């Protein structure tokens, strides 16, 4: 099943211009517009992947403690989560997320997204729409994303799932108004290198933001959430092969509401609510911040 959607009218771009008439659409968003398609084949590739990072960052382990350490493969280094004091020039880190390839999932137009079932209550309809068996790996992937989108917000969190560019824009404007900017990870070129060194010019962009994690689905779905007392940074990086990048990192100042079995506490050997915990954002994560 691969249902292509005509992009002749460019409705998503027109919506962007209506909201931000004096601002060009960022490249990170333009890349999510073509081809506008629902693609079941992509699900198969995602289901085969053992990568759990996006799921972990989108959920922060707030839900089921039994899922905190998937497949028993718990990272043992501090490069996934780290302390705020480590965010300084010269610090070397292995950033697997920044080096991995982007997914091909793109936004579908808002009318299409709204016509496709998207809830646990309607999960049998979702399976029927994508012609999937209930126990297939692809079905499990869809279910995880829908469950993540429907999980209750924790204390200090506002959350929303966007399945079209229009709803993605709305998620930012509804909280901050139109005087906002969109931040994204920037990589000079594709690289297999995973080791980067933090350069000069680490910049704190504020403590009010909406972090939007790209979830695993047959089209682009972003889990957007704002968590109290969270700072976002832009971090210049240089890879061991010379590749330059600008990455996004967040530091959570208050983790007292997090699940005590969250992976971050296991890696850093600290308890909830004791110290700020930081992590770089996955390559396709987008962040709204006020200007």
State where each predicted segment sits:
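Intrinsic-disorder-preferring feature that marks N-terminal prepro/targeting segments
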Residues: 1-167
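Folded, disulfide-stabilized extracellular/luminal domains of secretory-pathway proteins
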Residues: 116-291
């Amino acid at each position: 099943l691969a249902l292509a959607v005509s992009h002749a009218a460019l409705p998503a771009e027109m919506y962007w211009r209506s909201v931000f008439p004096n601002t060009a659409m960022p490249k990170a968003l333009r890349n999510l517009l073509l081809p506008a398609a629902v693609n079941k084949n992509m699900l198969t590739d995602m289901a085969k992947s053992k990568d759990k990072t996006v799921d972990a960052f989108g959920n922060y382990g707030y839900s089921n403690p039994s899922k905190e350490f998937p497949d028993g493969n718990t990272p043992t280094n501090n490069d996934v989560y780290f302390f705020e004091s480590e965010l300084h020039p010269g610090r070397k880190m292995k950033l697997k997320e920044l080096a991995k390839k982007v997914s091909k999932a793109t936004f579908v137009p808002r009318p299409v997204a709204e016509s496709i079932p998207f809830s646990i209550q309607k999960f049998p309809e979702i399976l029927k729409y994508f012609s999937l068996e209930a126990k297939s790996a692809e079905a499990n992937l869809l279910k995880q994303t829908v469950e993540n989108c429907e999980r209750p917000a924790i204390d200090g969190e506002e959350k929303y799932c966007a399945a079209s560019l229009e709803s993605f824009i709305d998620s930012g404007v509804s909280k901050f108004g139109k005087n906002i900017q969109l931040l994204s990870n920037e990589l000079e070129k594709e690289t297999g290198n995973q080791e980067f060194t933090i350069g000069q010019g680490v910049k704190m962009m504020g403590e009010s933001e909406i972090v939007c994690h790209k979830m695993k689905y047959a089209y682009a779905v972003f889990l957007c959430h704002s968590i109290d007392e969270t700072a976002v940074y832009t971090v210049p990086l240089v890879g061991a092969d010379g590749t330059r990048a600008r990455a996004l990192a967040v530091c959570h100042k208050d983790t007292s509401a997090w699940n005590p079995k969250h992976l971050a506490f296991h890696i850093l050997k600290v308890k909830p609510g004791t110290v700020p915990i930081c992590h770089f954002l996955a390559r396709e994560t987008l962040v709204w911040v006020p200007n």
